[in-house]
Amino acid sequence: MGFLSSAILLLITAFPAAQAGEMINAAAGATDVIPDSYIVVMNEGISESDFESHRTWATSMNSKSRKRAGAFSGVSRTWSATGMKGYSGSFARETIEQIANNSAVAYVEPDRMVNITAFVTQRNAPSYGLGRISNKRPGNRDYIFDESAGRGITIYGVDTGIDIRHPEFEGRATWGTNEINDVNQDENGHGTHTAGTFAGRNFGVAKRANIVAVKVLNAEGSGSTSGIISGINWCVDHARRNNILGRAVMNLSLGGTGARAFNQVATNAANAGIFLAVAAGNDGEDAANTSPASARGVCTVSASTERDTRADFSNFGSVVDIYAPGDQIPSVFPNNARRVLSGTSMAAPHVAGVGAYLMALEGISSGQVCNRIKRLSQPRIRNPGRDTTNRLLYNNSGV
């Protein structure tokens, strides 16, 4: 970089050349990448006007590339509620490389498919999860809890949607947003099942908590990273507008390949004042390789069995904060049905429910919840996995 006069060369150290953004490419052979779809994250601290100007420029660049390379939709989603400004869309390779080289951009990465983390379905199996988290010893089916039961706390179910009219939810469930299609109902059942665990009348932990459905996954239980980022941003904005930051919980029974933007938005949501319970994943491997389980500031949950062992499908590792029941868990399904599922998807809502329960009972804030859960937990898990906690969720019932 040169200047007209040597007298002002000192400015080079004070104002270095603007740095281009980082282009993060998918690993060779990756099967979860959405073709020609990208997530663009802006530099921290960028102003709203500069962000808008950048998007206008990106749209212009995309329009030029469409004339040469075919149809690419360009910018499709934008977000900023968590403090991470960015957008997603479909771009030609030439265009996305120009975007990545823009000095306002921090990084660009591929958009990916994300899936629910349920594992096995078995009908008519017995329940043990509620009894297990409220008794220090296994074998007791009685669920023991304070009558406050999460009253005044809101839990966001970021999932396939929720059957909000199911009698299990007693009118406490409302529809929030849909970031994947135009069908405002749970087409899969997974989201209704997890909501039944964290706040259902019969199957739930926090039986008086409010429930908000945030649909980011389709009938097959799949969605995009960008859609989930939009859903998380919606939750933060909703909590802020309703003055419940610090008194809100988010259940994320989903996950995919480790993604920087996914982890960043999850961390930002936690920092904003929402307690995040996150499924560790069902690949039987280190959860450090998955998102958002590897995000800082979230409470990452592995799945235990009725025998207090790690479920063989459950991910493990140093990023895991707690174990919770996740094998053979019964709960509700759409259209007044019931279903038994297994997976870290079923473990995470136990933790979301206990988080809401403790926030209501003890008056603690969202940022204190995960550490409180870990302090109350019991050292019960046998063979938890390499570098993994052996602590099992417990609601401090005293029994």
From Swiss-Prot:
Keyword Plastid: no
GO cellular component: extracellular region
Superkingdom of the organism of origin: Eukaryota
Example GO molecular function: serine-type endopeptidase activity
Key words, A-Z: Glycoprotein, Hydrolase, Protease, Secreted, Serine protease, Signal, Virulence, Zymogen
Enzyme kind, highest EC tier: hydrolase
Family of this protein: Belongs to the peptidase S8 family.
Protein name: Subtilisin-like protease CPC735_033790
Native source species: Coccidioides posadasii (strain C735) (Valley fever fungus)
Upper taxonomic lineage: Eukaryota, Fungi, Dikarya, Ascomycota, Pezizomycotina
